[in-house]
Amino acid sequence: MANNEYSDFALLSLNEDPKNLSGYDPYYLGWDRITSLSSTGVVGIHHPSGDVKKIATSFNLPANTTPYWRVNWSQTTNGFSVTEGGSSGSPLLTRNTHRVIGQLFGGSDINCNNPAADYAIYGQFHLSWDYGTNPQRRLKDWLDPNNTGAHS
């Protein structure tokens, strides 16, 4: 449907609703095109190369390095969690609203000796919204086709 390398997003249309498939119980995420974040931090959910779900947490605000959010992961009771290869396109969510604010673009090489130095780079959803010269290069035409000004 739409994609743009500027913020590294792709919007796909499914041929069938996963709710109608036996053995699937999908969970749909909301989105938010906010341009600045509160102090609650962020969460990355990913399935690296199709592996079981992983969750990475940051209690800090991501750095705004337009067109990307740069996220340094925080230590939790389970240690450090980082994004892994094969997780590209996975969502970045706010910790308070659990809405998508970015999509994974890349990050640092994993450093097991210094996990606090690991970071991830996410394309900013709000830039994916209207950065592009036609509907095939931006999200607003697909997620708000009536141009209501929706933010989430």
Predicted regions and their residues:
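Catalytic nucleophile loop of clan PA
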Residues: 81-104
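N-terminal hydrophobic or amphipathic segments with adjacent small-residue motifs
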Residues: 38, 44, 80-83, 96, ...
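Extended hydrophobic-aromatic, low-complexity segments
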Residues: 52-56, 102, 111-113
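Serine endopeptidase catalytic core focused on the charge-relay Asp
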Residues: 1-73, 85
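Short, well-ordered junction/capping motifs at the entry into regular secondary structure
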Residues: 74-80
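Broad hydrophobic/π-residue packing in well-ordered secondary structure
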Residues: 47, 93, 104-106, 115
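C-terminal cap/linker of serine protease catalytic domains
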Residues: 1, 5-9, 16-25, 49, ...
